[in-house]
């Protein structure tokens, strides 16, 4: 990634995080923008989100993000339009890194316990 695309991705990550925090219902799961990857021509921004909640809440949150993509892009446009001629199209993808890290931690804890019992 070039320096420009990295800066654009960082700005989009900050602004999307703020928008999601203010615009989405507070009673639902916690949604965090983990990373934003943007194409070289700045036309598409892929936002990877971490959703902390039950599997049903995660599915509902992703569906909500997909439904509200246009309105989120419109809000984003009003906040950053002075930086860009054209606001990139948004795509939301679920990031499962937190869940994988948690599972690995559980496995390591199990290994530690079994090795402590064998000693």
Curated annotation (Swiss-Prot):
Record-level GO cellular component terms: cytosol
Major location (coarse): cytoplasm
Gene name of the record: rbfA
Transmembrane segments: none
Subcellular localization: Cytoplasm
Function: One of several proteins that assist in the late maturation steps of the functional core of the 30S ribosomal subunit. Associates with free 30S ribosomal subunits (but not with 30S subunits that are part of 70S ribosomes or polysomes). Required for efficient processing of 16S rRNA. May interact with the 5'-terminal helix region of 16S rRNA.
Family, similarity comment: Belongs to the RbfA family.
A Pfam family it matches: RBFA
Gene Ontology biological process: maturation of SSU-rRNA
Protein's UniProt keywords contain Plastid: no
UniProt entry keywords in alphabetical sequence: Cytoplasm, Ribosome biogenesis
Organism per entry: Pelodictyon phaeoclathratiforme (strain DSM 5477 / BU-1)
The protein's assembly and partners: Monomer. Binds 30S ribosomal subunits, but not 50S ribosomal subunits or 70S ribosomes.
Protein name, entry field: Ribosome-binding factor A
Extent of the signal sequence: none
GO molecular function, one term: ribosomal small subunit binding
SUPFAM superfamilies, sorted: Ribosome-binding factor A, RbfA
Matches recorded under HAMAP family: RbfA
């Amino acid at each position: 990634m070039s320096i420009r695309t990295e800066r654009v991705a960082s700005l989009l990550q900050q602004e999307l995080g703020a928008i999601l925090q203010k615009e989405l219902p507070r009673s639902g799961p916690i949604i965090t923008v983990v990373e934003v990857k943007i194409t070289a021509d700045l036309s598409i921004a892929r936002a990877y989100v971490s959703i902390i909640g039950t599997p049903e809440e995660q599915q509902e949150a992703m569906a909500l993000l997909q439904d509200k993509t246009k309105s989120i892009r419109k809000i984003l446009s009003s906040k950053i339009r002075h930086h860009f001629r054209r606001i990139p199209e948004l795509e939301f993808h679920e990031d499962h890194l937190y869940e994988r890290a948690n599972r690995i931690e559980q496995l390591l804890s199990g290994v530690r316990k079994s090795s402590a019992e064998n000693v």
